[in-house]
């Protein structure tokens, strides 16, 4: 049965598909597919026996509603980095549920991403002001991996060859400790978990991680310890609670070199563990080592301020195995939400929330003492931890009253607890404190007493208070009313380009439809309000959802098992390589440490390999863009005794189905290695071929590409891995679940990673069904080949498969334009903005080219509109080649053209205003204006500004 959803997911209608096939010389889609996908990997049919039949959105939502109802939403006061938070309705409606925000891509084309970049600059400013550190990035994946990145930075900048010890506060969050263990071992880093008072330093210590407040809730002044660490040449990272940080002096004042944490409690629901925006702030000295994206200010060609991604040369897509991190996707959408939460509340509002939580904590402590429950006299923020013989009874009474408390020690059943912890959050109030005290009173057999009045003094005496003005920037004060904030959000939207405006043809990025029905369940409280460490029997709906997804994805990829834990494609790569490494070690092959990687590979591949403790050896590609099989055989033979893995992307990064993929896998296996397949291009394979069936041992999938989770302007993403049966025992574990002895440690803070967005992919697969998924892949291939055909006479297609066809994307060669007219790939990218399009992927995997991926969701009219735009641009280049247009002062070199420039009283350019801004007739009805003119990136990197201007700076500028 054809899925009723299919016609909504596909851009081209059946009639348009037939037209496209005829253009390419085919009558039937099946005949076309047989020409594109090699015979030895093409499946006769998709896995109908495992995947559900397709259905409409109402049926799928009803089915998912039944699953969601299995989740029991209790009041979780567990804490440990996850807290209840109230997302302002304005932000939920105008940001979280707004496709103009969630369908955009990473802001590489900054001139059409100024709105998102401003929201991210607000986020960086928020973090910088909270921490007192001048450089903050635009988000990381979660707090645990941010701490691991801090360990990596500290290790990387240390120049003492003997230094390999990293000291970790014994009060660090348990999931952070677990992820640190995973990260440290492959790099040869020795971890020592110790009470800060007992920390001893020698020349082997390169770094320290402190938690403030600690997992036990305690606050203390780390100044003396940090001075001792610095005297020993070690960097100090402090993991902070951003809400607590509103009350006391910035951690930079105590001497911290790096601050990390999670912005989850700034308006982002717990979501059973994610996604949430982590943050990373550091000193100016480490600006070129900071991981992740960094937004900075520069100027455009007209001299106006403009924002863009700064210092990109340190990132994995350029530095590869020498990169500071393998991070690619981060958590932009969640960082944007957190930034608007801060704009919504302002510094006074944030502080008021924090002070209220301290008051509730003091009130609860006082109530416990009236019940003769001993509470240590100490400064805390929002958390109380208690050791008592009544702990099992307290947990039972709290559960009966609808509360989940932290079970102490971590990881034991509540019936065996020796203590409990309570962390108050934004939903807490005095009534909740009273209910908790009633539960404790029942547990300890004391009469129920009236809760003490709210504490008047909320000072945190062990730490100096925050007294300097902070968040003085106008953005955090100007939008107090909902009307003003709504207009501000919309003003930023108008400065961006997303899928609501038109096709985003980025190669290797799969910017396909993110259907509203797929995203709707993410806001359901059954998914949004669960704590990741809640009792497992309260998350049966999530387990059902995960089981379905794991089973469906395994069937589609041909693997035996799937882990959904990795919360980005880069994390999937890393996890997959660790699984391979663990398998080799289980066989006594500890010496296998060589990872073969084609020279065309995405930069995350070598960066991930290095993080996994492997050494990268490059494999050449031939003139057709395929892996040079002779060179592969030579490298495999040369390193046969040490070969751990080959990392290969399929279809290749050059946009073709290589015919020798089975043979490539056989060569690697014959020499003792495993095959890691990068699933970035899986959108060309779903329902047509299965990596596990043609020789891959591991494959990561990008749910934010192939399976419809939106890109969010640069995250969130999900990067699960599928593995063959012999590798299944080594899939990532987690300390809060039953972790097997063979499992590698966790790669993400939560067991299910970014759990709350998994319903998106579940909905997509449920509505599509097996046959529709195969059809979608086929149409993705058809659309790419249609564009390749239309554009080939104007921009040669650089690589084609054995039958002359491309896969789901194609590379257009622009290098002759540079030679003949002085027009480079950036000129084309910027000129496309004037035509209303985001540029394709620029200068990757081949410099001077663009890589185009249309996906199956774009209509024939949109494909033609894009082709017409590129052909018109080619005509403009010809005018330069013939001398009809000036070589320097032309629409390409001056692109993009802003409304201000076009409407200026003086127009001194040798081409018309219409040619500048309305080069195609249909643009008079649908015009997207770049917010700024071409940005000077070099100027911005030389004059790095990564926070909003202060009131004083704004006043001076005015």
From Swiss-Prot:
One of its GO terms (cellular component) is cytosol. GO terms for molecular function: glycine binding; glycine dehydrogenase (decarboxylating) activity; pyridoxal phosphate binding. Its EC number is 1.4.4.2. Keywords: Oxidoreductase, Pyridoxal phosphate. It is an enzyme of class 1 (oxidoreductase). Its cofactor is pyridoxal 5'-phosphate. One of its GO terms (biological process) is glycine decarboxylation via glycine cleavage system. It catalyses: N(6)-[(R)-lipoyl]-L-lysyl-[glycine-cleavage complex H protein] + glycine + H(+) = N(6)-[(R)-S(8)-aminomethyldihydrolipoyl]-L-lysyl-[glycine-cleavage complex H protein] + CO2. InterPro entries: GcvP, GDC-P_C, GDC-P_N, GDC_P, PyrdxlP-dep_Trfase, PyrdxlP-dep_Trfase_major, PyrdxlP-dep_Trfase_small. The modification N6-(pyridoxal phosphate)lysine is found at residue 705. The glycine cleavage system catalyzes the degradation of glycine. The P protein binds the alpha-amino group of glycine through its pyridoxal phosphate cofactor; CO(2) is released and the remaining methylamine moiety is then transferred to the lipoamide cofactor of the H protein. Belongs to the GcvP family. The glycine cleavage system is composed of four proteins: P, T, L and H. This is Glycine dehydrogenase (decarboxylating). It comes from Synechococcus sp. (strain CC9902). The gene is gcvP.
